[in-house]
Amino acid sequence: MLDAPDTAVLAVNLGTPETPTAPAVRRYLAEFLSDPRVVSIPALLWQPLLRGLILPLRSSRSAAKYAQVWLPDGSPLMVYTRQLAQAMQALLPSLTVRHAMRYGEPALGSELDCLAAEGARRIVVLPLYPQYSTTTTASVEDRVDAWQRRNPGVTVSLVRDYSVDPGWVEAVAGSIRRYWEQQGRGQTLMFSFHGIPQRLADGGDPYPQRCEASARAIANALGLASDEWQLGYQSRFGRERWLQPYAEPSLWALAESGVKQIDVVCPGFATDCLETLEEVAMGFTETLAERGATMRYIPCLNAEPDHARALARLAVASLA
């Protein structure tokens, strides 16, 4: 696709604890929840609460959840991100393709340092967040901008959003089609996206519009009528109002209205992780079963060939 030996692509995912243990989860959450892009409460107020109450309470509980989805080679997010970067490398043999995490290891800044030390003079940073948000993509952008100021000899570009990129949309639609061909089609398809606080959207974060655009584009690619799919938001944290409709209560309402088989896909997540596997595939399925309905979870794209091809094309296009 491109002959550029001094060019690298760095695929950046959110991050994961190194092990499914309370100490590892505590280290990870401490970094993640200390990012002002994630929690905007002033540090003088937030840090005592975080370290004195939230981390002691959440670390063990979260570790138990991670243990339920952990793979032999590590956390699903890490395993699939690594495999995805390897698949992209196979498609871009004249470039260097690596992966990094915004929180945890391999750290974003360290991987940029390594690529520069190895001779990269152009680096494409590809956050694995299809829909731009100030809580995710912008946090990566902050780190990249700070690194760029310290390393003016390297040109860094960043893919900010690919929520309606045709290659990515078709990759998601194709994965859903294949699932339906093998397993049959449910009565309704739910697109479940990670939520953000409503106040961020009110303040101008375009994330909900990006999610809606993604859902519409995928539904159109599948030929779905407007009454054959829904959108919801999951993973609410804290007590404030987040984006609505909330996914799980929406699923309950479908079950209570007589819908007995519901398919759920999470196109805001590039790879499967705790939120898709434990919260959705396990948790949503269980609570829907209690209401007499069956939920089938359609996996994320992970390292599927169509996913790697779509992201490789995005990286190359950003170099034009």
Curated annotation (Swiss-Prot):
Source organism of the structure: Stenotrophomonas maltophilia (strain R551-3)
Pfam families in UniProt: Ferrochelatase
Binding-site residues, Fe cation: 194, 275
Catalysis performed (reactions): heme b + 2 H(+) = protoporphyrin IX + Fe(2+)
Enzyme Commission number(s): 4.98.1.1
Function recorded in the entry: Catalyzes the ferrous insertion into protoporphyrin IX.
Key words, A-Z: Cytoplasm, Heme biosynthesis, Iron, Lyase, Metal-binding, Porphyrin biosynthesis
Database matches in HAMAP family: Ferrochelatase
Family note: Belongs to the ferrochelatase family.
Protein name: Ferrochelatase
Entry's Gene Ontology BP terms: heme biosynthetic process
Main subcellular localisation: cytoplasm
GO terms of molecular function: ferrochelatase activity; metal ion binding
Compartments reported by the entry: Cytoplasm
Gene, per the UniProt record: hemH
Gene Ontology CC: one annotated term: cytoplasm
